[in-house]
């Protein structure tokens, strides 16, 4: 899975409406530089999903790759955990 020094992120799929593209939100915690309080940060990434296997709510692992479109810089590596459908 390690290819050069590419970023590997784990996040939750929030949209799978596009063809071969998913939107993944990655949540991180960081300390405030002055006050030291833990703050939640979240960032959305568009990732390439060649076979449309990821569904909304899934936990996925994405890896940095060459630019695939104007906004896509990541590709789907694996679905870590499938969403529970009630």
From Swiss-Prot:
The keyword Zinc does not apply. Keywords: Ribonucleoprotein, Ribosomal protein, RNA-binding, rRNA-binding. One of its GO terms (cellular component) is cytosolic small ribosomal subunit. The lineage of its organism: Bacteria, Bacillati, Bacillota, Bacilli, Lactobacillales. This is Small ribosomal subunit protein uS17. One of the primary rRNA binding proteins, it binds specifically to the 5'-end of 16S ribosomal RNA. Part of the 30S ribosomal subunit. InterPro entries: NA-bd_OB-fold, Ribosomal_uS17, Ribosomal_uS17_bact/chlr, Ribosomal_uS17_CS. Belongs to the universal ribosomal protein uS17 family. It comes from Streptococcus sanguinis (strain SK36). The gene is rpsQ. It comes from the Bacteria. It holds the Pfam family Ribosomal_S17.
């Amino acid at each position: 899975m390690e290819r050069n020094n590419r970023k590997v992120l784990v996040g939750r799929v929030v949209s799978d409406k596009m063809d071969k593209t998913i939107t993944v939100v990655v949540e991180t915690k960081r300390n405030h530089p002055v006050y030291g309080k833990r703050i939640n940060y979240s960032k959305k990434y568009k990732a390439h999903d060649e076979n449309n296997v990821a569904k909304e709510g899934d936990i996925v692992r994405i890896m940095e790759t060459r630019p695939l479109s104007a906004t896509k810089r990541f590709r789907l590596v694996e679905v870590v955990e499938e969403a529970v459908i009630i």
